[in-house]
Amino acid sequence: LDTKLTIGDGGLFSQPFQNVANADLSNEYGSCESLRGVINTPLGLFFISQQQGKIFQYAGKGMDPISNNGMKWWFNKYLPSRFIKQFPSSENTQWTDNPVAGVGCQVMYDSVDDIVYFMKKDYQLKPDYIGQATFVDRPFKPVEIRGEARVPVSIDIGDPVYFDDCSWTVSYDPKSKAWISFHDWHPELALPSINHFFTTKTVTTTIPQCPPGYNFNST
């Protein structure tokens, strides 16, 4: 109907929008695809741009790619989803951006220590099963393995027989603008709290969980 409506007194929405990044739209610079991959804190807004392999902080003075602080190439390689890369048809389904039942990213803020935690839950097929697996978008066991058997075997995402765990957790200190450490806990769900935060994990193990690109040395 070519009709324009203004909410309230119009003072807020009558102003032209301003870009927070000087980049073409086609670059999708600073895009966030993760529902749980963003958190607002007293130190600014932190969010994950998984497809670009970057992590940003926005504190009112433009976007700061904090992933560039000494870990640019590590995040560029290990932040994008390995599962989606192997199963492109899984993108935008109920199994991606879903760290509880599938794969996805989360961000949590510890208000006591002023530390931000970035968590990624991800899996990739073991080399022996590449080319034998297909993704089927359904409410349960969305991956089918077609081996020598005539009937395909339906499996869960992350089944340790068929998948390698690519999950990791890393912490960042906004005060010193530095990455602190990797952590061997990779939660399925993280929940904010007035003090620290909560995480859930249904499967525990005594095997050290190293981030991709690193190995555990007991000595």
Question: What positions do the PLM features span?
Answer:
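Beta-sheet-dominated scaffold domains
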Residues: 1-218
